Amino acid sequence: MDVESIVYTYHENEVTFRTMKQLKYVILATMALVLVYGFNSGAKDHFKKLKTLTQIIRLVNENYVEEVEMEEILNGAIVGLLDKLDPHSTYITEDQFESIQEQFDAEFEGIGIEFNIMDGYITVISPIPETPSSEAGLQSGDKIVRINDESAYKITQKDVFEKLRGPKGSQVEVTIRRSGTDDFSVTLTRAKIPIHSVLASFMINDEVGYIKVNRFARSTAEEIATSLYELEQEGMKEVMLDLRNNGGGMMDQAIQIVDMFVDSRDTILFTKGRIPNSNDVYYARKSRKDKDYPVVVLINRGSASASEIVSGAFQDLDRGIVVGETSFGKGLVQRQYPLNDGSAARITIAQYYTPSGRLIQRSFDNGIEDYYSDLVDEDREASDSTLAARPIFKTKQGRDVFGGGGITPDYHVKLDLDFSESTRNLLTHKDRLIFNYADELKSDVINTYSTFEKFLANFMMDQRKQKLFFKWLNNKELEFEKDERIENWSTIGNRIKAQLANAIWGKSSMYKVL
């Protein structure tokens, strides 16, 4: 039987070409396996398994009780194959490719809003400064109800990107619904929109600077260098680098950031893998002559990958103090391989090691489910604090640091998650209740406080505001006992104040409140 006769599917007596093409790839992969390995016994076993897989796909397609979407089935088979390797090798479909690539880009073309879909409409979380949306006066809380005179009700996130993004210089008309005014339309000319890695940069006091970094993308090192320079001009004598909940990104950006602070020829990182070109050592190239001030790196269990490269290098080279929780423990190097159909495979080719030789990667021997559930284990830090079973490594100056996965901080500060269930539901509610309540307070705050500094010093979430908030919350299907209201009000009140700061003065102001 030839390839063409094997790889067919029936749909109302028509051949589905795309499925036929994908099944053909399975057969061709089988042939390629034989060509690579020859006809030894191992290759014959692999050949038999691939042949079995092809037979199963054909049987499912012809006999399953309901009609199946073969593309979905085949994608699932590919994902299942990569899942068997490790938690971070992954398959990227053609549809996913563009959005995943954007995680590493420094810009896109569009109107410049951070948004969420709430009550069926695009809701502006905040306009990005110096973009068409901010220049047109869009505000946090605005709802986009029509796009080019078509209803935007129940729009999907995918459709938002398709309708609001577009080439620089092209135009889009949006109709805005704003509390207290009639609906109005604005024509926006699309532009290049920066995607910032540095969310906030400011002086905490006269000597300490603070930089919040949320990812490692193509512009991250450059953004941090700019922030450092600006803070130095304000008199900064030490810096706090906040990498909490930063899931990582581009390895080269992490290396460039460490390189700003360490001595020339210090080892920043090394990698080890099975193939020769996956083994490498990365050395510092610059002198820290103008970056010799103290550094504190903040991490938590959400700090992963490139965040662990930075925090691990600062710790091992005795260049900074690491504070917070033990980090995620993702120390696998992925290389992305483009595939002929526009999809891609991201495959682990090596492991990261810190300068002292610590492997960053946590064990995943017990499976992916345990691998991720370990992160929310409340006893994770308690067990880590004993450090009894963990290997010991030495820093550049001879201090003990601990291996075993992730970066263990020099000073452990527990993340305060001791909320009541009602408070946790409030903070994570799908309808973003904190955002909505802050949006209702926004106009009064703008009228009362002319500057953020006055707001920060004088706006208090007092007992009167507490009563008003819980009265507002009564019809939102969230119940709070009286004791819960008292015990958790400082957290809830702080989040409301921070959201107000973000809506009116931007993200740096929000982090000053938090």
Where are these regions (language model features)?
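Bacterial Sec-dependent N-terminal signal peptides
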Residues: 8-46
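Polar, glycine-rich mid-to-C-terminal structural blocks
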Residues: 306, 318, 325, 329-387
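Cleft-lining beta-strand/loop regions that shape enzyme active-site pockets
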Residues: 37-49, 53, 57-70, 123-126, ...
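Conserved functional hotspot residues or short segments at active or partner-binding sites
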Residues: 359-360, 364-514
